[in-house]
């Protein structure tokens, strides 16, 4: 991609000339250690699902160098995480351990670390891994060497500047978007997780350089935000779109609202790059979800965004029925590559997880769809009306300060910092999910219908925030209007070759 055209946003409309079979240059970030992290017994968040996804990719032959570049990410450093997160929060994550946590009760409460977001062995390394992968993927796109970058371990959209939330500790999405803003005047963020992408929305609520669009379950459901009336604030007014949905939405209903809205967004906003959070808890049968999307229906969103031929970052997110998550992200990797994968799963290390059907496809169920055509049409018209109030993208003046995203200064005893941001790195973070019906906690609602009190629904996490209340801490103080094209060299470790993956399941195939 020619940097001189970065602000133009590429194609604004899906192109018939960019057929699904047309090849894209794809890079995929993966750290063999990511599947070893463990949130604890009974916790629904399982990083192991990323390892299962990787095994499927290996046995389908998608890790071959001829298919895509496979990269091992470099870990994000403190200074990298502090481009968005507060210094004291990052210092806490770095220092806390399962053994010392009970000596830091006040800090645990202050940073919302505990039940949903527990302290576990290797917590900080886990955050460094998935955040480093997402930032590295963004750098790869900025360099123009790849059209699509993938990090299935990322997509942790609930984390705030100084607070963990919904299984998320570090917001790798915000960090990746800040990296993309070095080159692109406008970045579009789309979230198809069943939970509202509150952390990303809050970070960019007052700027027009990032548009956020979230399709999510709304109501008495974690995190309790994402009202259609929340549209952004100040310079960011109308650059935040929320699409509230009800239980049981199926493929046809979902696409009837996703495609018209996103088509109009692409036409009006003309982003230079797109970040698509592919949370798999919107699939039918998810442990914590209540939607009824099939694997193909979920992947249709990826296919549609691919058709615009704009630099695309694919991230993971929620997903708690792990056999479905692995199949979904494997299938969507095939979509990114323009590869048709056979339905019958190849034999692999986790084959028994996928019985009795042993099919790549996640099927929808016969659950009731509570989204009527009338309701969906009203939502669509409301969103399109808000889009009509936007200035046309080419004439937008970006005068507010944008988050500072300069490459970190080198340490005398460290490797070249440019290498730390190389798109060749590959680690992803993936987390967040509401459970049950509480707008405050995901964990409390697994198998338990918990009554929500009036107080709970009106606190920081549970209330329906309107534009009058929702003026988040702007990413703000570090915002600057100048763009900087990253100069990092591609020095992350490529791990296409089977022997380089540290005996990771599937990597030797």
Swiss-Prot record:
E.C. number(s) listed in UniProt: 3.5.1.98
Annotated localization: Nucleus
GO biological process, alphabetically ordered: epigenetic regulation of gene expression
Region annotation Histone deacetylase: where it falls in the sequence: 24-338
Stretches the record annotates as Disordered: 394-509
Tissues expressing the protein: Expressed in roots.
ATP-binding recorded as keyword: no
A single Gene Ontology CC term: nucleus
Cofactor(s) needed: Zn(2+)
Site entry (Polarizes the scissile carbonyl of the substrate), positions: 320
Catalysed reactions listed for this entry: N(6)-acetyl-L-lysyl-[histone] + H2O = L-lysyl-[histone] + acetate
Keyword Glycoprotein: no
Up-regulation conditions: Induced by drought and salt stresses.
Biased composition (Basic and acidic residues): 398-409, 418-434, 448-472
Active-site positions on this chain: 158 (proton donor/acceptor)
Sequence ranges of Polar residues compositional bias: 481-494
Superkingdom of the source species: Eukaryota
Cofactor info, note text: Binds 1 zinc ion per subunit.
Residues noted as binding Zn(2+) in the record, renumbered to the chain: 193, 195, 281
Major place of residence: nucleus
Note: Plants silencing HDAC3 exhibit semi-dwarf phenotype.
Family: Belongs to the histone deacetylase family. HD Type 1 subfamily.
Protein name, UniProt field: Histone deacetylase 2
Taxonomic placement: Eukaryota, Viridiplantae, Streptophyta, Embryophyta, Tracheophyta
Designated gene of the protein: HDAC2
């Amino acid at each position: 991609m020619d940097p001189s055209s970065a602000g133009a946003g590429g194609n604004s409309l899906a192109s018939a000339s960019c057929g699904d079979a047309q090849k894209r240059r794809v890079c995929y970030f993966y750290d063999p250690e990511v599947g070893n992290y463990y949130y604890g017994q009974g916790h629904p968040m399982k990083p192991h699902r990323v390892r299962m996804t990787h095994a499927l990719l290996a046995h389908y032959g998608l890790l071959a160098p001829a298919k895509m570049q496979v990269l091992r990410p470099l870990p994000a450093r403190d200074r990298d995480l502090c481009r968005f997160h507060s210094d004291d929060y990052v210092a806490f994550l770095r220092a806390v351990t399962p053994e010392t946590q009970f000596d830091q009760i006040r800090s645990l409460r202050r940073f919302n670390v505990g039940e949903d977001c527990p302290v576990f062995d290797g917590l900080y390394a886990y955050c460094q891994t998935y955040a480093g992968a997402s930032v590295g993927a963004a750098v790869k796109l900025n360099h123009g060497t790849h059209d699509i970058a993938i990090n299935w371990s990322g997509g942790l959209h609930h984390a705030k500047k100084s607070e963990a939330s919904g299984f998320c500790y570090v917001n790798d999405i915000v960090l990746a978007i800040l990296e993309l803003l070095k080159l692109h005047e406008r970045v579009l963020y789309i979230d198809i997780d069943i939970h509202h992408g509150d952390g990303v929305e809050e970070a960019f609520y007052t700027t027009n350089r990032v548009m956020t669009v979230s399709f999510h379950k709304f109501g008495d459901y974690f995190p309790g935000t994402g009202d259609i009336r929340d549209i952004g604030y100040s310079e960011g007014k109308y650059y935040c779109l929320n699409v509230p949905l009800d239980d049981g939405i199926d493929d046809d209903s979902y696409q009837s609202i996703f495609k018209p809205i996103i088509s109009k967004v692409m036409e009006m906003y003309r982003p230079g790059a797109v970040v698509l959070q592919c949370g798999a808890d919107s699939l039918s049968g998810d442990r914590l979800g209540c939607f009824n999307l099939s694997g193909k229906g979920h992947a249709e969103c990826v296919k549609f965004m691919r058709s615009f031929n704009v630099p695309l970052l694919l991230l993971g997110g929620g997903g708690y029925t792990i056999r479905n998550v692995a199949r979904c992200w494997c299938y969507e990797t095939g979509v990114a590559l323009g590869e048709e994968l056979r339905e019958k799963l190849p034999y692999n290390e986790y084959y028994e997880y996928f019985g009795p059907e042993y099919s790549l496809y996640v099927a929808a169920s016969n659950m009731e769809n509570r989204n009527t055509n009338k309701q969906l049409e009203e939502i669509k018209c409301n969103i399109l009306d808000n889009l009509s109030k936007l200035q046309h993208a080419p004439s937008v003046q970006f005068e507010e300060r944008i988050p500072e995203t300069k490459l970190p200064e080198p340490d005398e005893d460290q490797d070249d910092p440019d290498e730390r941001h190389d798109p060749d790195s590959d680690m992803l973070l993936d987390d967040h999910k509401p459970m049950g019906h509480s707008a405050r906690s995901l964990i409390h609602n697994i198998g338990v219908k918990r009554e929500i009190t009036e107080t709970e629904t009106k606190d920081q996490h549970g209330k329906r925030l309107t534009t009058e209340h929702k003026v988040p801490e702007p990413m703000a103080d570090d915002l600057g209007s100048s763009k900087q094209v990253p100069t990092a060299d591609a020095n992350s470790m490529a791990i296409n070759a089977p022997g380089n993956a540290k005996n990771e399941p599937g990597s030797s195939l």
